Amino acid sequence: TLALATSGLSAWCIVPALNGSANSEDTGVKETTGSSAYLYSATVGGGYEVDCRQRDLSNNVSGAWTRDISSVNNAAYLEGVSRMFAGHEVCLQFSNNLTTPVRVEVNGSWDSN
């Protein structure tokens, strides 16, 4: 069957303090094996920065972290890996820095590609 990428997905989540992590509100479907996902129009509360990566929920593999996403640096391609197969369910995973003392709200949109 043909797997079509999903776009305009919600990246919203609350990331716990002190290196906490959280997944995006929406999940999407990979259209192309190993492709990068795209995060755009991101906002990160309190002027903080978070890290983000693409995560394959179907087989629990993740791409590399993209560092320092913020309300200013608010778009990024999130690396895929060869084991992220077309048709698999994927999400974005966000992580706070070790030194971020508060939980942080992240918002934005993303495409699974």
Model features per residue range: what roles?
Residues 1-5:
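Classic N-terminal secretory signal peptides
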Residues 6-113:
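Post-signal peptide N-terminal regions of Sec-secreted extracellular proteins
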